[in-house]
UniProtKB/Swiss-Prot annotation:
InterPro entries: Papain-like_cys_pep_sf (IPR038765), Peptidase_C19_UCH (IPR001394), Ubiquitin-like_dom (IPR000626), Ubiquitin-like_domsf (IPR029071), UBP14-like (IPR044635), USP_CS (IPR018200), USP_dom (IPR028889)
Molecular function as annotated in GO: cysteine-type deubiquitinase activity; proteasome binding
Keywords linked to the UniProt accession: Hydrolase, Protease, Proteasome, Thiol protease, Ubl conjugation pathway
Biological process, per Gene Ontology: negative regulation of ERAD pathway; proteasome-mediated ubiquitin-dependent protein catabolic process; protein deubiquitination
Protein name: Ubiquitin carboxyl-terminal hydrolase 14
Highest taxon above the source species: Eukaryota
Species this chain originates from: Caenorhabditis elegans
Role, per record: Proteasome-associated deubiquitinase which releases ubiquitin from the proteasome targeted ubiquitinated proteins. Ensures the regeneration of ubiquitin at the proteasome.
Catalytic activity: Thiol-dependent hydrolysis of ester, thioester, amide, peptide and isopeptide bonds formed by the C-terminal Gly of ubiquitin (a 76-residue protein attached to proteins as an intracellular targeting signal)
């Protein structure tokens, strides 16, 4: 597919054109870049105006220049005096609201896709610079290219200011999603976790071909052994790689860690060669490699034959804001985690010492010593993208509200990589929320239930030793030795 240069006002964009698709798809790409709706676009190619339905009479050549005309909104009229006063009055409020991250418009049952994109866009390694996007285009994968463009648009503060918080309409990405994965029919509700897994498989593969080892950031490695409970027979160790852990939900599961362990330790019936019959076996799985980003699917849906739907388990499953995976790991990995975990105690002691010191210093001096920690590496030196402590901080959640995976509503709750605040991304609506709202999504009713969790490796800081504390003036005066006075002879 040819790559062309599109000039619009003072901007210039490099766009890949698929002439096998209707021109409306190309105009949707331009809309994603400029926010000029297709109805207001006038695209001129070699003196001809491009229509919406076909490319008849128009030939697209590599690196050719295409002109586009059209404004984002209505052509503004000269403001009246009252309008100028109102604009000045609202300027500060508009700038603050414009800095809120952009939402994604629901194009018709596309909330499942929007929540996945809002989750992945907070993974800093997936947000590329414009020059880096060119390397993605070289692999002729339109879905990955459109997703990379979408991640950038959602993290672009300048774009947010220009659009004043207007939501992005992800036409191009939705169209190419269904092309790459036919199970996601256009504008039909789908399973958000299935969508997330599909997007991650595409992105990790194409980014990897382009020189970025994204796969290592999500890869979990497990070791599984099987032991016969009726003999001494033990199966060979099986090593598997996955991009996600599963929390199985049953009547005994109330906490996330319990549900994960339920899948790691199971009894089952299988053939025993030693006994020459079926026997009971114990399966034991342990994690031998932890990634920087850990995704966990709370397995809330099951196929209900009577209604022929993926019905939802409404049971509450509590999840932590800080997750410790140490007990899920193999002994070999546990031994490797010990060193960085010891740094956590040192970090906590240093923070406590600084809190006490701040009480005897002014605010400016106290802030300086409190923020003097240096972040330690979160990965092992010989394993990029790993987690060397076993500790994670919750970064985001995809929740579902409804009774089956094919209906209801999906939203994303994300902690910003920039300001650390939690925000609810409900399609085009973006609001700031607190941790209490996050913890309420554990389930147990018809409210939003956590379905997919994204954890990020905890950043541990190393603090320098503080200088001796200054002695308060009053104390120094009280403890000073009395001066000797000589007696007159």
């Amino acid at each position: 597919m040819p790559i062309v240069n599109v000039k619009w006002q003072k901007e210039k964009y490099v766009v890949e054109v698929d002439t096998s698709a209707p021109p409306m798809v190309f105009k949707a790409q331009l809309f994603a870049l400029t926010q000029v709706v297709p109805e207001r676009q006038k695209v001129v190619i070699m003196g001809r105006t491009l229509g919406d339905d076909d490319w008849e009479g128009i030939t697209i050549k590599e690196n050719m220049t295409i002109m586009m005309m059209g404004s984002v909104g209505e052509i503004p009229k000269p403001p009246t005096v009252l309008e100028k006063k109102q604009a000045n009055r609202d300027k500060q409020a508009e700038e603050i609201s414009a800095l809120y991250p952009c939402g994604l418009a629901n194009l018709g049952n596309t909330c499942y896709f929007n929540s996945c994109v809002q989750m992945l866009k907070e993974v800093n390694e997936l947000v590329l610079k414009p020059a880096e996007e060119m390397r993605i285009r070289e692999h002729n994968d339109r879905l990955c290219h459109n997703l990379a463009t979408l991640f950038n648009s959602l993290r672009d503060k300048d774009r947010a200011l220009r659009s004043k918080g207007e939501p992005i309409k992800p036409f191009a990405a939705i169209l190419t999603l269904s092309d790459s994965f036919p199970q996601f029919e256009k504008f039909k509700q789908q399973d958000a976790n299935e969508c997330l897994v599909s997007i991650m498989s595409n992105v990790t593969r194409i980014y990897g071909l382009s020189g970025w080892n994204i796969e290592s950031l999500f890869r979990i490695q497990t070791e599984t052994t099987m032991k016969c409970l009726e003999s001494d027979e033990v199966s060979e160790k099986k090593v598997e790689r996955n991009n996600q852990l599963t929390c199985y939900v049953n009547q005994d599961v109330r906490f996330l860690q319990t549900g994960i362990k339920a899948g790691f330790e199971e009894e089952m019936t299988r053939n025993s060669e030693e006994l020459n019959r079926d026997a009971k076996w114990q399966k034991n799985t342990q994690i031998s490699r932890l990634p920087k980003y850990l995704t966990v699917n709370i397995n809330r849906f099951f196929y209900k034959e009577s209604t022929k739907t993926n019905a939802k388990i409404l049971k509450s499953v509590q999840f932590p804001m800080q997750l410790d995976t140490y007990d899920l790991c193999s002994q070999e990995l546990k031994d490797k985690l010990v060193a960085r975990r010891a740094d956590i105690k040192l970090e906590e002691d240093a923070k406590l010492e600084r809190e006490l010191r701040k009480k005897v210093l002014d605010k400016e001096q106290g802030d300086k010593i409190f923020d003097d920690g240096v972040a330690l590496p979160t990965a092992f030196e010989d394993d990029a993208g790993s987690n060397n402590s076993g500790f994670y901080d919750l970064k985001g959640i995809i929740t579902h509200k409804g009774r089956s995976s094919q209906d209801g509503h999906y939203v994303a709750w994300m902690r910003s990589s920039e300001d650390g605040k939690w925000r609810l991304f409900d399609d085009e609506h973006v609001t700031v929320v607190d941790e209490e709202a996050i913890l309420k999504t554990s389930g147990g009713g018809d409210w939003h239930s956590a379905y997919v969790l994204l954890y990020e490796a905890r950043v541990i800081k190393q603090f320098p030793e503080l200088p001796p504390a200054p002695v308060p003036t009053e104390v120094a005066a009280d403890t000073a030795e009395p001066m000797e006075v000589s007696e007159k002879q």
